[in-house]
Amino acid sequence: MNIVVCLKQVPDTAEVRIDPVKGTLIREGVPSIINPDDKNALEEALVLKDNYGAHVTVISMGPPQAKNALVEALAMGADEAVLLTDRAFGGADTLATSHTIAAGIKKLKYDIVFAGRQAIDGDTAQVGPEIAEHLGIPQVTYVEKVEVDGDTLKIRKAWEDGYEVVEVKTPVLLTAIKELNVPRYMSVEKIFGAFDKEVKMWTADDIDVDKANLGLKGSPTKVKKSSTKEVKGQGEVIDKPVKEAAAYVVSKLKEEHYI
């Protein structure tokens, strides 16, 4: 069994700031992490490796520093890593990104492709399904459980008010959610060992793709501006006996027409 896991290195949203003039994310000085849903996808691939001897390859698109996410994935237990990095990929929206990653995946052997449900720096949930379309394989999204029976997978797909169980044959793309598992910790030995492993670097010339579909040229959508919500509320400390405090809260709620 060969598994490919799509990873994205994203800024830690707990420390994200917005440039008030440009309306863009300020990434300088902000620590980066593996996108959380992608980490669940990787963990499930590693579970299948533990149980069935699967070979796990991680792939990412990004600048050279995105290699850090792939090294972390190798430390967790991935067998191989590929970074798609080229200035031609810059400015890509979800469509151009999916074109690029799918072209990279086509160079690899795969039975299952895992991706996270969505990235925390965009929240579109588009790249995984788009990759499946470019590869011409079925997809199951919002996956919260995976069972293997030969070349057939039994998948539990989450819905807002329940779940659905589906069976699908490989090859298939699955998008993971946090309920799927708890990602493992890395051992010190594996962390040091990961730095000795090769991360393959592929440019636009290394993949079979129409360059008109890459980067800014291949992106039909443009982000004009990003912003954070302005916090308008204010707190008030009520220093009164319990009954008086309760009456005061009720009066305030009525005053604001909440009750």
From Swiss-Prot:
Q: SMART domains annotated for this entry?
A: ETF
Cofactor(s) listed? FAD; AMP
What is this protein's record name?
Electron transfer flavoprotein subunit beta
Keyword annotations: Electron transport, FAD, Flavoprotein, Transport
The Swiss-Prot or TrEMBL record annotates one GO molecular function as: electron transfer activity
Q: Does the keyword Metal-binding apply?
A: no
Details of cofactor binding: Binds 1 FAD per dimer.
Entry's InterPro entries? ET-Flavoprotein_bsu_CS, ETF_a/b_N, ETF_b, ETF_beta_N, Rossmann-like_a/b/a_fold
List, alphabetically, the SUPFAM superfamilies matched.
Adenine nucleotide alpha hydrolases-like
What is the source species?
Clostridium acetobutylicum (strain ATCC 824 / DSM 792 / JCM 1419 / IAM 19013 / LMG 5710 / NBRC 13948 / NRRL B-527 / VKM B-1787 / 2291 / W)
Its biological purpose: The electron transfer flavoprotein serves as a specific electron acceptor for other dehydrogenases. It transfers the electrons to the main respiratory chain via ETF-ubiquinone oxidoreductase (ETF dehydrogenase).
> How is the subunit organization of this protein annotated in UniProt?
Heterodimer of an alpha and a beta subunit.
Family the entry assigns: Belongs to the ETF beta-subunit/FixA family.
Gene name on record?
A: etfB
